[in-house]
Amino acid sequence: MNIGIVLIATKAYFVLGIRFIKRFMHFYKGTGDITFYFFSDTDPTDYLPEGINCKFTYVTNETWVDGTNLKFVSILSLNNCKSGYLFYFDADTNIIKDFTEKWFIGNMVGGQHYGDQDWMKKKKDYDRNPLSKAYIPFDTPLPQMYYYGAFFGGTKKNMIKFCELMRFNQLDDKKIPYEPVFNDESYINQYFHHHPPEVVPSKNFEFIISDKGRIGTTGFMNQNTDSLKNEIKNLKNNIFDVQYGKIVY
């Protein structure tokens, strides 16, 4: 089984993207052939040990919104890749225990947001602009669940088809012009609302979402992480985590 893992790790997210790859391979106990598709403004080659299959594509962005909106177009560039499955994870996702692909593999998969049964239990954070392609009305008759923008995936064929529509919707909204409050996540939720995926319930989600290791607080994306990059480059064979803004082994 050829599984492609897609990461977008520009600017300060680079360090976290390297963390994800190393910890993924360290804790992975499955049988799949794993390829990482690493979209970044920094080549990861000198930061990773030999034996990890990581394919680098240069991308850059000026704002966080531009960065998060790179997801669909980046995945579309993988149309001719050899991976039979493609799964996107946010670069600031962390892994702390052994796992296999069984918890996330599927034909088209979405993750139940951890807030779905918390602050969003009564009212989901859907986009409510009726002019937007991400629009879901308050009085929708369909069952409601709020999904992560930080994780989604499936077969390559399904992912390419999905991302083609998501990218079309993004570009169509730019003509208004309009940017949904939760960006790509709003489009993902609109699609899954009408086309329910195989769901990973939040209680079964085996990774930690949005763990930035306290690298800065505001304006995180543009934090200077040169010292962290130098440290992990010099110890590229070591598994590490980021805690309180520092590298820990």
Language-model regions, residue ranges each:
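N-terminal anchoring/stem segment of glycosyltransferases
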Residues: M1-G67, N79-S83, S227-E231, L235, ...
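Short, hydrophobic beta-strand segments that form beta-sheet elements in well-ordered domains
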Residues: D33-D41, L86-F87, D92, V109-G111, ...
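Short, polar loop motifs at secondary-structure junctions
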Residues: F38-D46, A91-D98, N204-E206
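Active-site regions of enzymes building and remodeling cell-envelope glycoconjugates
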Residues: P49-E62, W103-G111, I215-G219
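A conserved donor-nucleotide-binding helix/loop in the catalytic core
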Residues: V59-F89, V181-H193
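GT-A fold catalytic core of metal-dependent nucleotide-sugar glycosyltransferases
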Residues: F72-M120
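PAPS-dependent sulfotransferase catalytic domain
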Residues: K102-K161, L165
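Catalytic core and acceptor-binding pocket of nucleotide-sugar-dependent glycosyltransferases
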Residues: F138-K233, V242-Q243
